[in-house]
From Swiss-Prot:
The keyword Ribonucleoprotein applies. One of its GO terms (biological process) is translation. This is Large ribosomal subunit protein bL32. One of its GO terms (molecular function) is structural constituent of ribosome. It holds the Pfam family Ribosomal_L32p. GO terms for cellular component: large ribosomal subunit. The keyword rRNA processing does not apply. InterPro entries: Ribosomal_bL32 (IPR002677), Ribosomal_bL32_bact (IPR044957), Ribosomal_zn-bd (IPR011332). Belongs to the bacterial ribosomal protein bL32 family. Transmembrane segments: none annotated. It comes from Psychrobacter cryohalolentis (strain ATCC BAA-1226 / DSM 17306 / VKM B-2378 / K5). Residues 1-20 have a biased composition (Basic residues). The gene is rpmF. Disulfide bonds: none annotated. Residues 1-22 are annotated as: Disordered.
Length: 60
């Protein structure tokens, strides 16, 4: 197993972890329906980039 030669400081550890933060998902608004959705995902009613891809049933 690898063993470090010298202890890393808190500063070095935190600098390494600086890229590990959580990012907020980007939100877009559909041009056709005006509904908010995640980028590159379709809306809940089946629209993506102005076209309806799926017919969503109202049973659920």
């Amino acid at each position: 197993m690898a063993v470090q030669k010298s202890r890393k400081s808190r500063s070095r550890r935190d600098m390494r972890r600086s890229h590990h933060r959580m990012e907020i998902a980007e939100i877009s608004v559909d041009a056709t329906t005006g509904e908010k959705h995640r980028r590159h995902h379709m809306t809940k009613d089946g629209f993506y980039r102005g076209r309806q891809l799926f017919k969503v049933s109202q049973d659920a």
